[in-house]
Structure formats: structure tokens, C-alpha cells
Regions:
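Charge-rich, well-structured scaffold segments of protease-associated domains
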Residues: 1-11, 59, 73, 77-80, ...
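N- or domain-start disorder-to-order transition segments that initiate the globular core
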Residues: 2-47, 519-525
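Short acidic-hydrophobic surface loop/beta-edge motif
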Residues: 27-34, 270-283
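Active-site-adjacent "gating/activation" loops or surface patches in catalytic cores
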Residues: 32-47, 283-291, 299-303, 342
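Short pre-active-site segment immediately N-terminal to the catalytic Zn-binding motif
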Residues: 55-65
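Active-site recognition of the HExxH zinc-binding catalytic motif
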Residues: 64-76
Length: 525
């Protein structure tokens, strides 16, 4: 038994595997916390910019955006740190190099990083208390503030019943972007039977159907140690961090009675090739857009997913790339882009048009098929493929995404680990993948992949966003509906709404208690 295995065992962790990985300039250790069921990956190297993240598998089961609202809400105070905005306080007092949280279509991630070990322990403490012991159970106003609530605005005949809330307003903005609406339409067409048919961020129509009880129930079911993926990164004291995790959170949580894990399903979609999907949207005619999508395979097929990304760059990465050139010359849109959507169970390739002309969706399908056939039969420009391969390798090696390496690598690891425990570190390795693909360039591999993706693929879809009316007309129709809803309220209902808003404003404006602020950890000067 190695020293690390002994340390792990002393804190309730079972060492599963240790593997040197040159791409992370260190060793990846996989562990399992027996009592709680938590998974843990320790990426051990000499990086002084240390990182911690905890991720939960949170597949959406509807369009209410419950996990997006939870991501916001758990960071509004917790049992141990009952302050309203710990984020704001930590940004002032911590040496953090990264402090954020993210909602994905099927997971919610809470990463932090710091160059100071004590600071990282402090940040970890705040985050773990937030996700496992949030104030949402004793302060319903958090749900109203971050999720949604109703308000009465205006006076007399102009009075309107409106919905407000941080996530609600955020998604109204996000889904006023045609590209976002197009992606959602394409994803729903490709995956009609799985979580990816839903907008995990929430839609303005569905968010107000989420109840406070449903909000809490989703937290109880998904924010559990046996649904958690913990990643430690950098040059840090394993004994200290594993001990902290075990003694402060995992062991106490394991001691509490709980039922079997019951999270929303995250299944695989059987191949589908539905009729083209048209999504009406109140937007200007020049915002019309269209896309075709082709499922590449499963996330575990690492080399195939990387190869598809290289292929898309080769044929769509620049204006002179073959498929993009043909699409632009056809005059069916102002611009064309291609990319691979990963960090999902079944990654897919997308060719998308912006500023699409009428009939562009049909033309897009025909042009993609014809050009793919020409390239598959006549051969790709091998120099173009090699250049795309070298660029992809450079991007992976440099990891220059504006985040600390520990955060980037945690996100990379979760792009594969979430879907399979067989090889959690698969998405951290890339040298062998690129070496293999470099050999295959001359063997016709990319031409074969082109044929498999675009010509012989029985899992594909097409979607378009069709402008229906001006933004102004849509806004006036919405306002008219809000005025009508306000007029239909009884006096008691209106009074109840006003009182709830008054209580919310009072809670928002009340300062944190000095004793609560003092509980937040700070580095000694």
C-alpha cells in the first residue's frame, strides 16, 4: 500500500487507481468514499494554482430550469455561513483565482481555485456547506428571488401582472437570441426521448410552473454525496484535504438516513431522423437561422469525437474551407459555422446558417449531402486535415481558455466521467489520440468518417428558426396579456402578491448580521 493509499484509507477513501498522465504533468488518483458513495479524482502535480470542484449529475426532466435556479440559490447562504451573498464577500477577502458555478444540460458544477492552500480549504468549506446545507429550506425568499415571483407594476388600467426573478430574466435574455433557440430546437429534434430535449436553463414559459416544493425535492434527490464527483487539483496536501472532506462533510452526511439514489434519468437516444423542425420566433427577418445536426457516437468514443472536431474544423473552420465555401457561394445565408457539441452523452456535429434566406434549411441539407459526397469520393485535402489536427492538439495542450488549469481539466474530465466510471480520466489524455489520428490521415480515415457522419448516419436532424413578427409586436402582445392578468385578480389576490413582494424586498434590503459575516473564513493578514 502506497503512502497516498494509506492516507486515503485513514479518511474513509478506497484507492481505485493511480495513473501517471503526461498531459497533466502528474498523476491522476481515483478514489471512492465508501460510507457516502462520493467519487473523487485527485490530479496531483506541481501547479501552485490549486483547484477544487464538486459536480452533481442533474439531467433536466422539464423546462423549468430547476437545476439552474438551484445553482444560483444554494450560493445565497448556508447553515454554517448564513450570509446572503457569500460570493461577493469571498471575492473581496479571498486569494481566489477562480470562483464560479455552472449549469450544463446534464450536470451542475461548482469549481474554485486559489494559489493559497488555506484559502482553497476555506473556499471548499463555503462551497460544500452551500451545496449540502443551503439556506433554501429555511428561507423561501431565495427561491422567489433567484427563480421567479409575481409582481404588480403600473397603476390603474395600465397595471400589469409580471413575472420577475434572476434566472427568469436571465433566460428571457438568453432565449431572445436566435442561435440559442435554434440549438434548443435542434437538440430536441435529435434527442426527443432524453434529457437533451429540454432547456436546462429554463424557459420563460415553464419557469413559473416550478413550485417551491418541487425545487426543494430536486435538491434532496440530486445534491447527495453518492451523486457527487469531487476533483482536487495541483500541489496540495492530500492528507489535509481528504481529511477535511471526510470529517466535515462526507462522513456526517453518510451517517444520516437516506433512501436509494433517485436522480432524473440520463439515457441514450436511439437513432432518429425526424422531419425538419421549424421554430417560430418573434424576431426580425434577418435573424432567421437553420442548422443540421449529426450524432457522432457516445462520449466514451474519445478518438471518434476528437476526429469529428478536427474534421469540422477542416471543412468549416475558415471561409475557404470546402463546405463553408460552397455554403457561402450558394447565397443562402450571411454566414455558416460548424462545430461539435460535446459535454453531452452523445456528442453531435452541427452545420449552422446565420442570416438564413427563405428555403435555406432545405438547401442546407442538400448542399451538405452533396459536398460531403464529393469530398468522401474525391478525397479531402490532407494538408487541411493535418493543419486542423495540429490546431486541435495545440488548443488541448495550451489550455488557454482564460481559466486556471485545474478548472479546465476538471471540466474536461467531467465531459467523460459523468457518463461512465469505466475510465474517468479518459478526457484528460490526448497524446495517444492525436498520434493515432495523425497516422490515419493517410489511410482514408477522415473520408470514411465524413461518409459515416453526413451520408450514412441514421441519427440526424434539421431545425430552423422562422421569424414571425417584430420584437416590438411580441412585447406589446406580452404587455397586453399582463394587463389582462392583472385585471382578473381579486382584491385579496392582488393584496397577497403585493405583500409577498414587500416581504421579499425587505429580506433583500436587510443587512447581514455582523455575527453571520464573522463566520465567513478569511485568511489572516
Amino acid at each position: 500500500m502506497t503512502d497516498l493509499e494509506q492516507v486515503a484509507a485513514s479518511h474513509g477513501f478506497t484507492a481505485v487507481k493511480s495513473e501517471p498522465i503526461s498531459e497533466v504533468e502528474g498523476t491522476v488518483h481515483l478514489m471512492h468514499h465508501a460510507a457516502s458513495g462520493a467519487r473523487l479524482m485527485f490530479i496531483e502535480n506541481d501547479d501552485a494554482n490549486k483547484a477544487f470542484s464538486i459536480t452533481f449529475k442533474t439531467p433536466a426532466a422539464d423546462d423549468t430550469g430547476v437545476f439552474h435556479i438551484l445553482e444560483h440559490s444554494v450560493l445565497c447562504g448556508s447553515e454554517k455561513f448564513p450570509v446572503k451573498e457569500p460570493f461577493v464577500n469571498l471575492l473581496k477577502t479571498s486569494m481566489q483565482t477562480f470562483l464560479n458555478a455552472m449549469t450544463f444540460p446534464d450536470k451542475t458544477m461548482y469549481p474554485v481555485a486559489s494559489t493559497n492552500e488555506q484559502d482553497l480549504v476555506n473556499l471548499m468549506d463555503v462551497y460544500l456547506d452551500a451545496v449540502f446545507h443551503p439556506d433554501i429550506y429555511r428561507r423561501p425568499v431565495i427561491f422567489q428571488q433567484e427563480g421567479w415571483h409575481r409582481e404588480l407594476e403600473g397603476e390603474g388600467e395600465g397595471e400589469r401582472l409580471v413575472v420577475n426573478g434572476v434566472v427568469y430574466n436571465e433566460m428571457k435574455g438568453a432565449l431572445s437570441e436566435p442561435d440559442s433557440v435554434l440549438y434548443d430546437g435542434l437538440s430536441a429534434a435529435l434527442f426527443p426521448d432524453t434529457t437533451y430535449r429540454f432547456e436546462s436553463g429554463g424557459t420563460p414559459a415553464a419557469i413559473p410552473t416550478l413550485t417551491y416544493e418541487g425545487f426543494l425535492e430536486n435538491h434532496r434527490r440530486h445534491y447527495r454525496p453518492d451523486n457527487a464527483y469531487i476533483i482536487l487539483y495541483g500541489n496540495l496536501d492530500a492528507d489535509r484535504f481528504l481529511g477535511f472532506l471526510d470529517e466535515r462533510y462526507l462522513a456526517p452526511l453518510a451517517a444520516k438516513e437516506r433512501g436509494p439514489l433517485d436522480i432524473n434519468p440520463l439515457g441514450l437516444q436511439a437513432p432518429v431522423a425526424p422531419a425538419p423542425v421549424s421554430v417560430p420566433m418573434a424576431t426580425a427577418p434577418e435573424n432567421a437561422c437553420a442548422a443540421v445536426g449529426f450524432v457522432i457516437g457516445r462520449a466514451a468514443e474519445r478518438e471518434r469525437v476528437v476526429a469529428a472536431d478536427i474534421l469540422m474544423d477542416a471543412i468549416m473552420g475558415a471561409n475557404e474551407s470546402p463546405l463553408k465555401r460552397v455554403l457561402l457561394d450558394a447565397g443562402i445565408a450571411d454566414d455558416a459555422i460548424g462545430y461539435v457539441a460535446d459535454s453531452v452523452a452523445q456528442p453531435f456535429a452541427v452545420v449552422s446558417l446565420r442570416g438564413a434566406r427563405p428555403g435555406a434549411a432545405d438547401a442546407l441539407r442538400a448542399i451538405v449531402e452533396a459536398e460531403a459526397r464529393r469530398l468522401a469520393e474525391g478525397g479531402l485535402d490532407r494538408e487541411l486535415v493535418r493543419a486542423a489536427l495540429s490546431h486541435a492538439e495545440f488548443v488541448m495542450r495550451e489550455r488557454n481558455f482564460g481559466y486556471p488549469d485545474g478548472v479546465v481539466l476538471a471540466m474536461s474530465a467531467m465531459a467523460g466521467w459523468l457518463y461512465s466510471d469505466d475510465d474517468p480520466a479518459a478526457y484528460l489524455r490526448f497524446e495517444d489520440v492525436f498520434a493515432s489520428l495523425r497516422e490515419k490521415v493517410e489511410e482514408g480515415y477522415f473520408e470514411a468518417l465524413l461518409r459515416e457522419l453526413f451520408l450514412d448516419n441514421d441519427h440526424r436532424a434539421c431545425a430552423e428558426v422562422v421569424p414571425t413578427e417584430s420584437d416590438e409586436a411580441a412585447e406589446e402582445a406580452e404587455a397586453a396579456g399582463e394587463r389582462e392578468a392583472a385585471a382578473e385578480l381579486t382584491e385579496d389576490e392582488a393584496a397577497s402578491i403585493r405583500e409577498a413582494v414587500r416581504a421579499l424586498r425587505e429580506a433583500q434590503e436587510a443587512p447581514d448580521a455582523p455575527e453571520a459575516l464573522e463566520k465567513l473564513p478569511q485568511l489572516s493578514r
